[in-house]
Amino acid sequence: MNNNVITAQERKNRSITILQAQNVPYIEHLPFRYETEEVTPRDKKEVIERAVCSFASIMCALSISKGEYSQEDRVYAEDFLSEKYNVLELLTPMEQQVIAGTISEAGAMNATWKYESLWVLLWALGIVEELSFPNEICDCDLIMDTMDEFEGLDDFMAHTTLRPIEEILQALDLHYRYHWTTVNARIYGSDLAGLDEDIVMERRAGLEWLCCKGQENDNLTDSDNAWDHPELGT
């Protein structure tokens, strides 16, 4: 074994140290997520493409939820995806419904929460400096400015660096434990410690996607794919 590889137990220990410093309730016996060797890292191009697709869907979902989605909006989104990034065929089934304007109002509202999963992808790409304590929504203006900044996939690729998988796994372990805290608080009325469950859940979803390459639910064209329907048990 490579002695430089951090074990799942070590990640758990680091997370618990953080939770203790933040006065966030936790349980010692919550299982691990992954050992490093269990995970196939996603490449930078794949993460960028997912970020671009998610961004376009979120923008359309925001318009739908306000009752303002137009044919011009749809054409603009499709051109953004096909002409600027060539990723139109990489949309998930739910994203396809959003951009087609056929998703329900409730579905569109849920789709807007993907902002937090997208925030995680931009963190993984080094654009977002850190994943701060999940009690406030992400900087939506920064996301929009970022997506407006790049001229296309090559430009995006040239100006970003994917974080090491060890760093991503550490963030996943911490948010997994945050998620347990929020679920326990919702069910049993225990201390929430200032956490926002929706933010925690969506950020964890983004981190889970970064770590589930090659798994059964990794095919984005499937209706139960890991982006639209992440497995978030605690």
Segments (PLM) and residue ranges:
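Extended, charge-rich alpha-helical interface modules
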Residues: 2-234
